[in-house]
Amino acid sequence: MTMEEYVNAYYGGELGISKRYGISKADDLTYTSDPSAAFNTTYGATVYNQLNTKSEVFKLLKKEPWTQSGWRVMTGRHATTAGVAENNSEAGGTLPDTDKPDITNVEATLKQIVSTWEISTKAAMLSEADDGLGNLAAFMRKENSEAHMYAIDDMLLATTDTVTAANFESLDRITADHTQRAYIANADADLNIYNITRSTDDWSHPTMQLATPGSAGHAALSLSDLDTLIQGALEEGVNYADLIFLTGYDTYQDLKALMQNDGANAAWNYNLAQGGAGNMNGVTGESGLAFDSRVGSYDGIPIFLSQHVEKDTTSRIHLLDMGNLAMRIAAPTTYVDSTNVAVTQKMSHEFALITAGELICYKFKTQGSIRNLNG
């Protein structure tokens, strides 16, 4: 019921105050001892989620059908183009040597991500009675759907040295440079991806910026870090319109403060037009100038936030070339159930959510990251 209905019922209807508290004109002492045993706490059918279930990373990535497990990349261009030298005694000269571009085959492994749960027939029946959750199956499906997407986002940003082979590949691994492996505390094999050995395949190295170049030391973010990262992607031929930044909430706040302190006045403003006080549930806040320091982009590159971005001391920053990233999907998120107890031979129903595919990177050098930040 609504709050208004509850109040009306409490003061005059089925929950009337006289019924609730036993108010009467006569002195009618009902209890002569502690009545605590007469009370039973009830909890209601609503569960208030205390967890941040916001998941956006999977949604950011374009989706492609899984039509093949491999693809080809060109890692070197034709290299013998040259002018023909004239021969003094002949009209023509010798042609340059023939050559061809270098082409490498890359292959990905299909990953199947599964969230399973089980509800006993007894729990399902009692959820509609007593002090249950109501439709328990619907509740579990909703909450586990959120948990499924949360887990996928967590995989997509897992730090390079903890990526599980059976999970989706990680953007954190894609944006990690093998040549600077010693400064990010990774084993040699941690940075290998698909069938690529990054210690020998230089074409698979992204643009990575360390807070303290050439060192494992941590340092505060600077705008020059961002500029260097962008420059590296531009030099590799990125389409500027395809770039986004992905970072955590703490580094985002550091970036806001940095832009203000460096005099980037376009990043913040006092808005005289928004002088009214805020209002929530009948309570009025303070009136005055509206100060807005939110940063939606840097140099025209949109900024996105995720709680899953790995922290060194503070969250890393990923520069992603979205035109060369995709989720290749073999099976979109699918809900399956087994509710026939004659088949399962137990008094319970089983459920699962399944997503099958893999994170694909078509070009590494236009991806990048800033690491070892501490503010």
Label for each model-derived stretch:
Residues 58, 71-75, 142, 146, ...:
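Hydrophobic alpha-helical segments involved in membrane association or supramolecular assembly
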Residues 4-12, 17-33, 128, 134-135, ...:
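Sequence/fold signature of self-assembling virion shell proteins
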Residues 147-158, 229-232, 236, 258:
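Structured segments of extracytoplasmic/periplasmic soluble domains
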Residues 122-128:
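Short, charged/polar, low-complexity loop and linker segments
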